Amino acid sequence: MSTGGPQKLEAQGGKEGKEWDDGAEHDGVTKIYVAAGGLGIEQIRFDYVKNGQPKEGSFHGVKGRSTISTIEISHPAEYLISMEGWYDSTNIIQGIQFKSNKHTSQYFGYEFFGDGTQFSLQVNDNKIIGFHGFADSHLNSVGAYFAPISSSLTTTPNKVEAQGGNGGETFDDGVFDHVRKVYVGQGESGVAYVKFEYEKDGKRETRDHGKMTLLGTEEFEVDSDDYITSIEVSVDKVFGYNSEIVTALVFKTSKGTTSPPFGMVTEKKFELKDGNGGKLAGFHGKASDVLYALGAYFAPSTTSTTPSTTKKLQARGGNGGASWDDGVFDGVRKILVGQGNDGVAFVTFEYNKGSQAILGDGHGKKTLLGTETFELDYPSEYITSVEGYYDKIFGVEAEVVTSLTFKTNKRTSQPFGMTAGEHFELKEDGYKVVGFHGKAGDLVHQIGVHIVPIFTNYRVAI
């Protein structure tokens, strides 16, 4: 095996049609276009980056009445590591799936059902930089060029210096994929407490610093398709403290959302921001009984793994409890619903991300009635809509969700709860549910969904 240049893996599938070769003189793959029809993959195209400049590829195959689906790869932080698929006796590629170092694509075409030949294009510690194969009216075969993953592609987060005083103990939360929620607690003189909810590899983690007071906390939640771009830090010298302390925080996001000022804004302000337009990925600073200083880590905004096709449907129900958002995944595997005396008291969802099953946080409060489970036959089964009811119940100020029913591409679940009150349906034709959000306290007050287009076609035996 040669290590002096790109490595070429032979095309998998049939050799019918015209041979095509995009070449290997690329830095990476930036976009993939796939059209899947009744007989398999009809057409495919790859866009690349070469010497830092975008390069459009050519279409291979002929698109019929099918629609073209796209995958965007955020070069250079994200790169393609494998392509998997299968072909049958027609020597046409029937289904394909792509994996990057950040996420796994939808399955395009038919899922493998046991009658055909599976293949995988992958080289350890290498990335895909080009494709080749054969195509006629459909994609007959596909192979790939690989090159070592350059260390220069590993983006080092930018650590922005902490602003404020020198008191307290140093903390450093490190770097995460996302900052999902920020909690700020006030004291008599400034910010006394902060808690940050992070996400890494699909799992939520929290870090807190300082000391919470009887004033409690205020929160700022970031939408799953948004990210924080800057933090304004107000500092001041306050009687009783040997150094300056943080008196207020203001957060701004890429979509133009600005939080209210959490605390007392002063004339002396600093802005924590990345000069390259990066997104917030973690915090560091100094704290004890108050927050003395705050700094931040920023990562390239291209590390966002949320597909641009994701939509967030507004949560339905009453305006009670605290907001929660599980984020966006590849799909839903399992749903657990717990009943209370008058409504839905608890929900939790098991998702799929890449090759991992991820159990989300519980929302609400379990009762002695326990939980009921609705399990999906993932990945061939997916949720297409969520129906429910919400109503005002005695002793609770805000309406609560009283019933939930889940519809998939194969069946409808039983109603979990009592079908009474205001009816709602969370649905958009051609989309499937890949995440949930809402509001909950001791009961579930609201529920909403994240959805993505349904790209997968499934072969039906007749």
Curated annotation (Swiss-Prot):
> What SUPFAM superfamilies does UniProt report for this protein, alphabetically?
Mannose-binding lectins
Q: Which UniProt keywords apply?
A: Lectin, Repeat
Q: Where is the composition biased (Basic and acidic residues)?
A: 13-23
Record-linked CDD domains? Jacalin
Query: What tissues has this protein been observed in?
Result: Expressed exclusively in flowers, in male and female organs, petals and pedicels. Not detected in pollen grains or sepals.
> Any idea where the Jacalin-type lectin domain is?
6-148, 157-300, 310-453
Task: Supply the name of the protein.
Answer: Myrosinase-binding protein 1
What organism does the UniProt record list as the source?
A: Arabidopsis thaliana (Mouse-ear cress)
**Gene for this protein?**
MBP1
